[in-house]
């Protein structure tokens, strides 16, 4: 029995909103895993910018790539078959330290989804078209150094900022400047 196509559905919705002119996908955190699904359906996608993100895991589920302790923890804290908002996955909410501005933090937290638990076990499309697109990596936090090193190994432009995972909210100008620089290195602005 196969459940909903989480990856294909997200890819189709993004492509429907963005196609019509050349565009770059900016993929943050777990959204990096959606690159194959987006690439499979987006006609005008010209490149990928990964921002403190996991790299694609085509043909595998998130649970096959994530630390087993994290996957087990998320299963324990799931209610009504939905994951809790990201900021509650931890012993204490990290957002006050990462987003000091109360209004910006409230806006961010207010938009955090409660994703279906089934998404964790959904298999990402096995396509490889994403690997043929120009790509770059922006590392914001040390937690994503392994991914940045892998991106560098692939020959992608990599930029490392010494900040934190949610810097696009608390330091948007700095992150935007780094993204613009990386986009230019791919030949897109």
Walk through the language-model features, giving the residues of each.
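Glycine-rich phosphate-binding loop signature in dinucleotide/nucleotide-binding domains
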Residues: 17-22, 42, 182-189
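Gly/Ala-rich beta-loop-alpha elbow adjacent to hydrolase catalytic centers
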Residues: 26-35
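Conserved serine/cysteine hydrolase catalytic core
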Residues: 7, 113-178, 186
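Active-site catalytic motif of lipid deacylating hydrolases and related acyltransferases
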Residues: 1-21
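Conserved alpha/beta-hydrolase fold motif
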Residues: 25-26, 48, 137
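Alpha-helical elements of Rossmann-like donor-binding domains used by nucleotide-donor carbohydrate transfer enzymes
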Residues: 9-16, 37, 94, 107, ...
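Conserved alpha/beta-hydrolase catalytic His-Asp/Glu region
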Residues: 83-129
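Flexible "cap/lid" loop of the alpha/beta hydrolase fold
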Residues: 40-88, 119-120, 124, 148, ...
């Amino acid at each position: 029995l196969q459940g909903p196509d989480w990856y294909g559905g997200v890819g189709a919705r993004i492509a429907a909103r963005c196609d019509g002119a050349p565009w770059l996908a900016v993929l943050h955190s777990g959204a990096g895993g959606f690159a194959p699904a987006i690439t499979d359906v987006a006609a005008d996608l010209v490149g990928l910018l990964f921002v403190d993100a996991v790299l694609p895991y085509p043909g595998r589920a998130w649970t096959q790539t994530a630390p087993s302790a994290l996957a087990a923890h998320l299963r324990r804290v799931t209610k009504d078959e939905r994951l809790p908002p990201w900021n509650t996955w931890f012993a204490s909410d990290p957002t006050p330290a990462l987003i000091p501005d109360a209004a910006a933090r409230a806006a961010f937290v207010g938009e955090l989804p409660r994703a279906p638990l089934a998404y964790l076990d959904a298999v990402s499309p096995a396509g490889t078209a994403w690997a043929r697109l120009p790509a770059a990596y922006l590392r914001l936090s040390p937690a994503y150094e392994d991914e940045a090193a892998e991106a560098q190994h692939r020959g992608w432009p990599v930029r490392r900022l010494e900040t934190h995972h949610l810097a696009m909210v608390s330091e948007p100008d700095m992150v935007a400047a780094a993204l613009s620089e990386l986009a230019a290195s791919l030949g897109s602005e």
